[in-house]
Each structure stands twice: as C-alpha cells, then as structure tokens.
C-alpha cells in the first residue's frame, strides 16, 4: 500500500487515474447530465481527527467534522451529492453547515444547488459569485458554461481572507489573486496542519490556467509560493486534483511552473507566435513527469503563452 502522502515514484505514475477526474474539469451542466456517474465511488481518507479528504469525479473535497457540524470544501458534481453526503455521514452524522468553493469551475461547484437547497451556507471569494452569476465561455475548451441557478450561488463572499472557528479548529481561508482563476482561495486547517489548495495545485501533472477568467502562470507561481511559506515537513496537502501530497511535492510543482515560465517567456518576449512557441517544445524535458494528465503539453504551453502575452 502506498503511503498516503508519498507522491514520488509509483504515486506519480498512477496519475492517469486522477486525470480521468481532471478531464471533467470544464464540464457544463448539460455534459454532466449526460454523463454516467453511477460507478463513481467517493473515497474518504482520514488525515487527522476530524479532517478528511474525499475523492471522486471532480475536485478533491476537504471536510472538517465535529460537534459544530460539517465544513466542506467544494462539492464536485450534482449527480454525486447523495454519494458525497453518504460518505460524510459515515464520518460524522452532523449536518453540513458550510460549503466553501475554492473557485468557480463546475467540477468544484456542481453540487452547490443541491447543497443550497438543503440549507447549507455556500461561501466563496467575491469573484466566484460574479463569474457564476453570468454565462461564461471557456475558449480553451470551446465550452459555454451557463449562469448558475440562484440556489447554487455563494450567499457569503469575501475579498481577501475569512476565518471559520469550528470543531476545535481554526480554518483560515485566503484569496490568492490571478492564479488558476481570478477567484481562488486556499484553506489552512491550522491546528491539524492540513492545507486544501484547490486547483492552485494539480498534483503530478500540468494544470489548467484559466487566463480568460483572471488566471496567470505568474500568479500560480506566486500563489504556490505563499502556501509553501506556511507548510511544514509534516503538512498534509489536499490538491485540487491528484493524490494527497506533502510540502516536497508542492515545491516540485512550483519548480516545474517556474521552468515552464522561464522556457516560454523569452520566446514571447522575442515576438514568437503561439504556434511557434508550441513548436519549440519548451516543456520537452518535463513532459515525461508532468505531461500525462488531462492537459497535454502543447495545450499547457498555449495557456502559458496566452498568460504571458497579457
């Protein structure tokens, strides 16, 4: 059995399994309705007393449970709500009081409407509500994402930080700008020494950078750097996609992002076209380790190019 926070060797080589989940990243509601979720299993991993990670078919979920109720980070897809709640009930039968959306993408917020109708309070950064409130177009995937229904929208929003005090834990939520999107937040479970990064961290493969909605390679690097400042050698890190990680894995990920930026930027500065930059294969030395996820190297280089052109 793999050590749950071992992320080298075999763990990174099974990333294709997690790529299946990440491949749903930009699913629209209509696509979700057509997909068969019947065989998806929600797996719970205990990190510390009262803190768990749930994995299924969307972004990894973080859970704080205890006498004060359930605090949940993200809710994957609407058809999985009952399975997610059943998995949580096995941990603790208390009601889900809060859902914190890490960002606006549908594989992290798809269960919002179901949760909102159950009386759960949905919380997110200001930009998450703004983006979810209107139709959006993701040109990188040629996907139109319709505005979310009212019940799915965050009812409490913040512009920088907010803190929850639940279950004997301090849950510090902080916005990191212009990273994966323009509305990303991470959650630090202070006493438990756990961090939920959301899609600021794709563990083991190239990330999607939604530069069309405020994301950037520069912001991703800066955001990961901020998380590394508070992580210690024993910190358990829940990524947006991929297996449970540690500080060393997050540091390796940041090194990769910097190498890609440093490979693409001189070409952008020299006035090369997007196709020229992609043809130059600036990620070639990294592709064996990072290029086996849902976003292939050429697509990732294209996103980095677009980010650096701004």
Residue map of PLM features:
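Short N-terminal segments immediately surrounding and downstream of signal-peptide cleavage
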Residues: 30-49
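Divalent metal-coordination and catalytic microenvironments
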Residues: 50, 64, 74, 88, ...
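Accessory terminal helices/loops
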Residues: 21, 25-35, 229-231, 243-310
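Bacterial N-terminal signal peptides that target proteins for export
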Residues: 2-19
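Conserved beta-strand hairpin/beta-sheet module of binuclear metal-dependent hydrolase folds
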Residues: 43-88, 187-189, 194-197
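Active-site metal-binding motif and surrounding structural segment of the metallo-beta-lactamase
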Residues: 44, 67-71, 79-123
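Metallo-beta-lactamase
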Residues: 35, 46, 69-70, 77-79, 129-176, 181-182, ...
């Amino acid at each position: 059995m793999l050590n749950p926070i071992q992320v080298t060797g075999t763990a990174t080589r099974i990333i294709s399994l997690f790529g299946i989940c990440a491949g749903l990243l930009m699913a629209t509601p209509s696509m979700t309705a057509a997909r068969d979720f019947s065989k998806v299993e929600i797996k719970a991993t205990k990190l510390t007393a009262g803190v768990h990670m749930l994995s299924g078919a969307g972004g990894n979920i973080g859970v704080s449970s205890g006498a004060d109720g359930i605090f949940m980070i993200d809710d994957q897809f609407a058809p999985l709500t009952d399975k997610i709640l059943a998995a949580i009930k096995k941990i603790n039968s208390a009601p889900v009081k809060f859902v914190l959306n890490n960002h606006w993408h549908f594989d992290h917020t798809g269960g919002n409407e179901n949760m909102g109708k159950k009386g759960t309070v949905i919380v997110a950064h200001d930009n998450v509500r703004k983006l979810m409130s209107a139709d959006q177009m993701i040109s990188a995937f040629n996907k139109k994402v319709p505005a979310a229904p009212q019940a799915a929208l965050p009812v409490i929003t913040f512009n920088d930080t907010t803190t929850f005090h639940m279950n004997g834990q301090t849950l510090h939520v902080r916005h990191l700008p212009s990273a994966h999107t323009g509305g990303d937040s991470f959650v630090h479970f202070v006493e438990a020494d756990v961090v939920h990064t959301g899609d600021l961290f794709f563990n083991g493969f190239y990330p999607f950078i939604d530069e069309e909605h405020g994301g950037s390679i520069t912001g991703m690097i800066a955001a990961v750097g901020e998380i590394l400042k508070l992580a210690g050698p024993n910190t358990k890190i829940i990524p947006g996609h991929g297996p449970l990680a540690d500080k060393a894995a997050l540091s390796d990920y940041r090194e990769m992002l910097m190498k890609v930026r440093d490979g693409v930027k001189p070409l952008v500065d020299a006035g090369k076209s997007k196709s020229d930059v992609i043809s130059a294969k600036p990620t070639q030395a990294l592709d064996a380790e990072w290029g086996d996820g849902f976003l292939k190297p050429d697509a990732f280089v294209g996103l980095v190019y677009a980010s650096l052109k701004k």
